Amino acid sequence: MPRLLTYNVHRCVGVDRRLDIDRIVGVIAEHEPDIVCLQELDVGRARTGFIDQACAIAEGLSMSFHFHPAMQVEAELYGDAILTSRPERLIRSASLPTVRGIPGLEPRGALWSVIDIDGVQVNILNTHLGLVPREQRLQAQALAGPDWLGHPDCAGPTILTGDFNATSMTRPYQLLANCLPDAQRTLGLKPSIKTFPSSFPAIRIDHCFVSSDIIVRSMSAPFSPLARMASDHLPLIMDFDVNPEATRRLVA
């Protein structure tokens, strides 16, 4: 059964303020996912030793990857990535809109890859939304629009995941949930699985939204001592099947 893991890795700095990429790799590897969606990766940044974290984690997991730099300061990059052990190709990697005139807002972006799941082309979209409700709404609208979820090529089996910085009570969440159902709600999970903060998870801001062709089998958030220490978020894991009647198209 395919397994997706989404994880805000906090630039591989744990709650003990220690930079440790191997610890992040260990948390992920323990659960043997087929698809990994990561947020808050540093690539070539002085603050984390100029390491390409996306490449290092992918190598540690023996996966291919695509990275999108939501923010670039000269040669230093910060952003998100999709990793997988399955055949894949990148469809789109781009910035999301922001609000001008508000100091301190970080640029945000998203990636869209197509991954082959037993001969079926599955759209995987990974994102990390902003902190301010107004920019979150703009970003959610963009994701729901013609460049992303509304694109004709995104009509098949689709998973949108990441750190949305938005709970289920917010307008950005509700806008996206109107496009694709929340995976946790398709399972009727009560209480819901929360991932932030990792030491005492009380908030649900990491989500998986799925199309009707994605059959969610189970969801979990590892709460091991290692997972609680490695990042300020816990990973969110989703086991799923793809509707066998979905169009079977091999990745080119």
Where are these regions (language model features)?
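Generic internal hydrophobic packing segments that stabilize the cores of diverse globular domains
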Residues: 51-54, 80
